């Protein structure tokens, strides 16, 4: 598991980007990868853990958990 900070997240569109704390490019984050019950959304500057995986358009955050 890696950690990072939510750069931005659009709850209406269901996606945003996470900046990894270890450095590197921002990662795409889709609401379907958020490990939570109910309405799945993230807030700007929120700390999260995640796993980087290859998505259809390149690396993306999966198994996102709010810390």
UniProtKB/Swiss-Prot annotation:
Short name of one Pfam family: CSD
Keywords: Activator, Cytoplasm, DNA-binding, Transcription, Transcription regulation
Residue ranges occupied by any CSD domain in the UniProt entry: 4-64
Molecular function terms, GO-annotated: DNA binding
Gene3D superfamilies: Nucleic acid-binding proteins (2.40.50.140)
Entry superkingdom: Bacteria
Keyword Glycosyltransferase belongs to the record: no
CDD domains: CSP_CDS
Main location group: cytoplasm
Subcellular localization(s) per the UniProt record: Cytoplasm
GO CC annotation, single: cytosol
UniProt-listed InterPro entries: Cold_shock_CspA (IPR012156), CSD (IPR011129), CSD_CS (IPR019844), CSP_DNA-bd (IPR002059), NA-bd_OB-fold (IPR012340)
Residues of the signal peptide: none
Protein name as catalogued: Cold shock-like protein CspA
Source organism of the structure: Bordetella pertussis (strain Tohama I / ATCC BAA-589 / NCTC 13251)
């Amino acid at each position: 598991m890696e950690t990072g900070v939510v750069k931005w997240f659009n709850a209406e569109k269901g996606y945003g980007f996470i900046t990894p704390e270890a450095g590197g490019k921002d990662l795409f984050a889709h609401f379907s990868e958020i490990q939570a019950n109910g309405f799945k959304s993230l807030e700007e500057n929120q700390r999260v853990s995640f796993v980087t995986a290859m998505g259809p358009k390149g690396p993306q955050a999966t198994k996102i958990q709010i810390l």
